[in-house]
Amino acid sequence: MAGSDLLLAGVLFLFAAVIAVPLASRLGIGAVLGYLLAGIAIGPWGLGFISDVDEILHFSELGVVFLMFIIGLELNPAKLWRLRSSIFGVGAAQVMLSAAILGGLLMTTGFSWQAAVVGGIGLAMSSTAMALQLMREKGMSRSESGQLGFSVLLFQDLAVIPALALVPLLAGSADEHVNWLTVGMKVLAFAGMLIGGRYLLRPVFRFIASSGVREVFTAATLLLVLGSALFMEALGLSMALGTFIAGVLLAESEYRHELEIAIDPFKGLLLGLFFISVGMALNLGVLYTHLLWVAVSVAVLVAVKMLVLYLLARLYGLRSSERMQFAGVLSQGGEFAFVLFSLPASQRLFQHDQMALLLVAVTLSMMTTPLLMKGIDKLLSRRLNPADDTDEAPWVEDDKPQVIIVGFGRFGQVIGRLLMANKMRITVLERDISAVNLMRNYGYKVYFGDATQLELLRSAGAEEAQSIVITCNEPEDTMRLVEMCQQHFPHLHILARARGRVEAHELLQAGVTQFSRETFSSALELGRKALITLGMHPHQAQRAQLHFRRLDMRMLRELMPVHTDTVQVSRVREARRELEEIFQREMQKESRQLDGWDEFE
């Protein structure tokens, strides 16, 4: 595709998305279906603006690649190990059962047994991009059904490898026999990627982050994702699987959240392009000439996969209110069918329009999924009483933070140690890479990044956290964070560090009441000790400290409207006289009472 044609195609994609997606969302059918309809409109069977569908479809697979990298970042090896039974149990059972049933049905419609095997495997796979997008839209990502769905999708990605190797064997081509030496070299190269990634990625990103240039960090992230995808494609393996592994290798690193926000904009655009390309690939000519066959095929495909998934969910022990959602979200055919059916060896297996019919059925099944999920939601809302599942608590991820601490200097470290000592889950954001490396050596969950970026806060768990503690060195950063949290995360309890009275006044004006002036409490404590050394009783010194704290806080609030005005000078003098009078009354009161307690430090 020439440069000018590529630019024109890009403009058409953006225009179609800007028009179709908001309309689809307003109609309540979801963004994914909007992208698919936009693709049909501008594709060769619609208005005909774009005809080179195959090249665009291949390029748009990068959206799935970026999505799998972000999913990998959200899963560490320990969590993957916990999911092993659902990945290799439910996932394997779904692929084998669905492929066997669908392959058998294809044989009854005139497919050879070899073509039926390939067709059954291709149809058994679900759309990773579609399913994960719908899971996020429906809030399933952190539920047990969402985790089980992800396990099934992950096994399907793993199953791509043997499926691609099986097709040449079924085609029976002599020049496509299995070269076991080549297979062995690919396995070694794959192992080398795992080992190299495990020990090299973090030092490389540490070196890049130390430059302090954000654009270079973004470029390095793109290089990692695209390089992993290209490497896996060269091995004949799934590009998405390669980037998923790269994400998992960095899931426990201090750069996890910064990597996620660097990739997220590209992921969203490329995923949209992928769905548009799938819509463009819909062959309406085949649909018109074989309308009944296609309609029955789509219905059977969705019904068989839903039945298999529902039964497996029941055997797995998924609670009743989530089984239908789990089965529905994975009921469609997937993007892997386009890859598998388009192989030269596969094309020799299919006769006449068989491959085109299967691809049309897959595309339409993807288009029906958003509507199916909408219907399932309505059905569940009518038939299920929330009380029906009270005996089964929903699965909730246990490593999401309760508190986010921004800045981990001496001030933030004291807060973090106190919270961790009381078993609170914290996530720390710090933009000084040397401090990040030091604190992670001591076992703190510290991540590199600039917390004044909205997406970094969201990635760090601000939507699930209960509180945020802001301990930035710069007052401007503190106020920017306060404004951002109030606008985008209003549920968060905001606690902030103020360097002095001016910053305290600004926080009060912004509506933040939970703050601490960094030297105030320590100065008061030292002042209390000074009173004791001058002969004052510890109990009396303690009360003096409390009176001073209360009066100072009251003054702070009263002077907030005029904290930049000379009016506050006279008010400060009045407050000092008031404080002296309070202390005089306290002295007289204490002289008539017995000692309360002695200093014990």
From Swiss-Prot:
Membrane topology: Multi-pass membrane protein
Transmembrane segments: 4-24, 29-49, 55-75, 87-107, 115-135, 152-172, 177-197, 207-227, 230-250, 268-288, 291-311, 326-346, 356-376
Keyword Transport: yes
Name of the protein described by the UniProt record: Glutathione-regulated potassium-efflux system protein KefB
GO biological process: proton transmembrane transport
One example GO MF annotation: glutathione-regulated potassium exporter activity
Domain RCK N-terminal, residue spans: 400-519
Taxonomic placement: Bacteria, Pseudomonadati, Pseudomonadota, Gammaproteobacteria, Enterobacterales
Chain's role: Pore-forming subunit of a potassium efflux system that confers protection against electrophiles. Catalyzes K(+)/H(+) antiport.
Subcellular location: Cell inner membrane
Entry keywords, A to Z: Antiport, Cell inner membrane, Cell membrane, Ion transport, Membrane, Potassium, Potassium transport, Transmembrane, Transmembrane helix, Transport
One cellular component term from this protein's GO annotations in UniProt: plasma membrane
Subunit details: Interacts with the regulatory subunit KefG.
UniProt similarity note: Belongs to the monovalent cation:proton antiporter 2 (CPA2) transporter (TC 2.A.37) family. KefB subfamily.
Organism: Klebsiella pneumoniae (strain 342)
One Pfam entry name: TrkA_N
